[in-house]
Amino acid sequence: MADEHRQPEVNIGLVGHVDHGKTTLVRALSGEWTDQHSEEMKRGISIRLGYADATLRRCPDCDEPECYTVAETCPEHDTATEIERTVSFVDAPGHETLMATMLSGAALMDGAVLVVGANEPVPQPQTEEHLMALDIIGIENIVIAQNKVDLVDAEEARQNYEEIQAFVEGTVAEDAPVVPVSAEQEINVDLVIDALQTEIATPDRDPSADPLLYAARSFDINRPGTEWGGLLGGVIGGSLVDGELEAGDELELRPGREVEEGGKTEWRPVTTDVRSLQAGGEDVDSASPGGLLGVGTGLDPSLTKGDALAGQVAGPPGSLPPTWESFEMDVDLLERLVGAADGEQIDDISTGEPLMLTVGTATTVGSVTSARDGECEVALKRPVCAPAGAKIAINRRVGARWRLIGVGTLTESE
């Protein structure tokens, strides 16, 4: 098939409670483990956002939905399969302490698979919290994977299915298909692919627009001990939501980095050039919008190591949205805390309280400088780059962790 079909064209999130099998399902669909961080391997949970690309295929000799596969050759007919499309999976951590990471990943998602373990009551805390996050951020294209059906009998699976249906009633996932699957045994993977093809279409994007890249990760790919002359520039990982990128293009990153001058500190944009591009696991000369992308730059790798540039927005100089050190937002609070056993009521936001805010892929802490009915003003510890009208996930400190309490809409600056 033509190479252009192999570049990922849509981002699909895997969300849900910890240990319900999100990462295992990504492996069944892509052949890749997204848990590569040493602490993740040791603890058996996702800590950072994980990424993997998968080329979805169909056998021309099989009927639907059995025709769908990720194999290049149909095991039943021994015929070459045809490429449908390549997708990028964003594997979000399900642990309650990593909600900010999940929210930053949700900004990249065009659709999502809500993974629900068939061997536990529904909903588990982060099942509920992640579904609410999808609703807040505006992700409507959802598939529900009822995973681990190999661990329960038919009656238990049926009861779990009914619990899922009752749980999603009245939510953004009310009409989402529920697909029984065993990611570990790779059972019903064809049904999952069929649901992805039906429910999560590739969005219409504008390749003629200015490039706009949301950064979710950044890396120093140089090995320790590399000679100065052999050092490569820092790498940014994220999603191109508009426009096209080519090697040699100039990029501006906002909010940039903090610099100190004359005893004062301020945030200044960073400019660089595109040295290399990687999409779908391959080096490419140009990248179209959609899917996940690695951008090799001319930046000093010390600026990009350890996800230091996660949350940045990149595009041609002068084309980016404003950078905000404070802003006003309209606020829509949830009625109760999701994921809490007691369903605690949510109090109004008050002046002086700290909030954790996720805007795009950026997460920052803001101090409320003014609070009124349905709106508030916040001063940010770390500025963000975002257009007016951007959606903001609002988290409040409750006990020992940040809890999702509502959604904001950015209106204007101080």
UniProtKB/Swiss-Prot annotation:
Its cofactor is Mg(2+). Residues 16-23 are annotated as: G1. SUPFAM superfamilies: EF-Tu/eEF-1alpha/eIF2-gamma C-terminal domain (SSF50465), P-loop containing nucleoside triphosphate hydrolases (SSF52540), Translation proteins (SSF50447). Residues 91-94 are annotated as: G3. GTP binds at residues 19-24, 147-150, 182-184. It catalyses: GTP + H2O = GDP + phosphate + H(+). Residues 7-204 form the tr-type G domain. GO terms for cellular component: cytosol. Its EC number is 3.6.5.3. InterPro entries: eIF2G (IPR050543), eIF2g_C (IPR015256), eIF2g_GTP-bd (IPR044128), P-loop_NTPase (IPR027417), Small_GTP-bd (IPR005225), T_Tr_GTP-bd_dom (IPR000795), TIF2_gsu (IPR022424), Transl_B-barrel_sf (IPR009000). It holds the Pfam family GTP_EFTU. Residues 147-150 are annotated as: G4. It is an enzyme of class 3 (hydrolase). One of its GO terms (biological process) is formation of translation preinitiation complex. Mg(2+) 2 binds at residues 19, 44. Keywords: GTP-binding, Hydrolase, Initiation factor, Magnesium, Metal-binding, Nucleotide-binding, Protein biosynthesis. Residues 44-48 are annotated as: G2. One of its GO terms (molecular function) is GTP binding. Heterotrimer composed of an alpha, a beta and a gamma chain. eIF-2 functions in the early steps of protein synthesis by forming a ternary complex with GTP and initiator tRNA. Belongs to the TRAFAC class translation factor GTPase superfamily. Classic translation factor GTPase family. EIF2G subfamily. PANTHER family: EUKARYOTIC TRANSLATION INITIATION FACTOR 2 SUBUNIT 3 FAMILY MEMBER, EUKARYOTIC TRANSLATION INITIATION FACTOR 2 SUBUNIT 3-RELATED. This is Translation initiation factor 2 subunit gamma. It comes from Halobacterium salinarum (strain ATCC 29341 / DSM 671 / R1). The gene is eif2g.
